[in-house]
Amino acid sequence: MEDQRHRLSTAAMADFVADGFLRFDALIPEPLNQAALEEMKALAPGKLRRTLHGLGGRAGRLERGIEPQESPESLTPLAACYPAPSALGAMLRFPAVAGIIESLVGANPAFDHDFIHHIPAGAPRGQHLHVDAVLEPAGQAFDIQLFYFPTAVAPGGGGTRFVPGSHLRRARAEGIARYQHVVGEQHYSGPAGTLLVFHQGLWHAGQPNPSGEDRWMYKIRLNPREPQQRLWNTADLRELQNDPRDHSFAHPGSNTVAQRFRRMAPWQRGHEGRYEQMQRAALWRYLTGDSTFDVDFYLTRQRVREGALGEAQR
């Protein structure tokens, strides 16, 4: 029987679908954090130089970094990225991290790209809100992005800003740059070894770092190479899964996936929440393979109407 110990639960997957992210505080042990930090410092100049070169920037003026291993090429299977003795590779293969990855994008997803984000102490500038794509296509398949912090980040210390629940809005990359101070947005701070896992569509931004400590973060994007259907530990799926009759205006359930999907961020209140419920239900149908799943009857109502129309046209 396949080992499920490190895979996500159905409850955690439902939280990911609802919020667009998961957070795992102090997940990576300190010796590995220290080794990964040293490797990140060595790799950072080279990664920045290659990025500027690709963008047509002034790459030639950058000092060549120590690069014990080149960055993987896009579409490389994750299992082939950063082989031993790489500390970043050890972090990605750490059992709890591997289980998270497998639950969301499969056992051996494709490497998309990665980058080392270094915000020096006292850095005054941050980023605007953005999505890491030009325009998200239709369909439910998704990439994930891991944000790994090998050192502690104090409040106000340059932690990533992000908007929970924004991932299903299919926004243009820069189309949300004008939004500021969104109600319910979070500013990351936390202990060393913390991992944030984002849906590709989550709105986020780098922050200024007025603190006296440099902030380091490693980000990697992964593409699924298999259908993302029931890849997690489904031992609790039967207990939490609801049928389409779970309807808050009729007979709502209590400990169900639908109940989790009714939980809204502060900016999603009112009728906005209904839109979010429909998007979450559609994504959950993809992940579970259950084409009847629904929250508050919205998708089912459409199917019933379409069926009635089909009968009338016969």
Could you describe each region identified by the protein language model?
Residues G190-H204:
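Conserved metal-binding segment of the jelly-roll/cupin
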Residues P29-E30, H117-I119, V134, V153-P155, ...:
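Short, solvent-exposed loop/turn segments at secondary-structure junctions
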Residues M1-A18, D25-L129, L135:
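Non-heme Fe(II)-dependent double-stranded beta-helix
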Residues E185, A192, E213-M217:
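Active-site lining segments that contact anionic ligands and/or coordinate catalytic metals
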Residues D114-I116, L146-Y148, Y218-L222:
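A structural signal for short, well-ordered beta-strand segments
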Residues G99, P124-S189, P227-L237:
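Catalytic core of non-heme Fe(II) oxygenases with the double-stranded beta-helix
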Residues L202, Q207-R314:
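Non-heme Fe(II)/2-oxoglutarate
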Residues P85-A90, V183-G184, A205-Q207:
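Active-site rim elements
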